[in-house]
Amino acid sequence: MSYSGEQERQAPHMALVPMVVEQTARGERSYDIYSRLLKERIIFLTGQVEDYMANLVVAQMLFLEAENPEKDIYLYINSPGGVITAGMSIYDTMQFIKPDVSTICMGQACSMGAFLLTAGAKGKRICLPNSRVMIHQPLGGFQGQATDIEIHAKEILKVKAKMNELMAKHTGQPLEAIERDTERDRFLSASEAVEYGLVDSVFTNRG
């Protein structure tokens, strides 16, 4: 069997994914651990935010909405960030679907990861106690003719302004504060993320 480049990159990691065996009336049934957790409406967003991963996350959210549009979805985030367009496809789907999406930061939520963390349903955005959050402005690098570079520079400024507006909406911070605080990398602890409005609470245990 031949693999695409993306499948080939994913294949070694898939070999390490544990399998869960369940007894049913029809006998034994095995799932990989992520598929089993999907039955509990849990989705993982881990690693770089890129098109392949974003498509998987979007597909899972749409599937869970079709199964039950009234039950919450739980999105666990451990990400250094990634591609803006890929992240925005996840963001728009989170806002589009009917179920509330509860976001939980474990490890880190940086850049686009932080943006998606704060885009969860109000009151249902959570940090685990030793996680960290980092916000900053969009990054971009371009080559080509001067005119093309100018076009791309204008576009990234538009994207920056749009993301700042959305971040202000979700955090409750003034737009001026968001513009100032995202000018450079800004790291926040779990409790600082609550104070800033990026999340609503820090959970140390399920109790």
UniProtKB/Swiss-Prot annotation:
GO molecular function: ATP-dependent peptidase activity; ATPase binding; serine-type endopeptidase activity
Domain of life: Bacteria
Statement: the UniProt record of this protein carries the keyword Metal-binding: no
Any Gene Ontology biological process: protein quality control for misfolded or incompletely synthesized proteins
Cellular component per GO, a single term: endopeptidase Clp complex
Reaction equation(s) it catalyzes: Hydrolysis of proteins to small peptides in the presence of ATP and magnesium. alpha-casein is the usual test substrate. In the absence of ATP, only oligopeptides shorter than five residues are hydrolyzed (such as succinyl-Leu-Tyr-|-NHMec, and Leu-Tyr-Leu-|-Tyr-Trp, in which cleavage of the -Tyr-|-Leu- and -Tyr-|-Trp bonds also occurs)
NCBIfam families documented for this protein: clpP, PRK00277.1, PRK12553.1
Function description: Cleaves peptides in various proteins in a process that requires ATP hydrolysis. Has a chymotrypsin-like activity. Plays a major role in the degradation of misfolded proteins.
Identification of the protein by name: ATP-dependent Clp protease proteolytic subunit
Organism: Pectobacterium atrosepticum (strain SCRI 1043 / ATCC BAA-672)
This protein's encoding gene: clpP
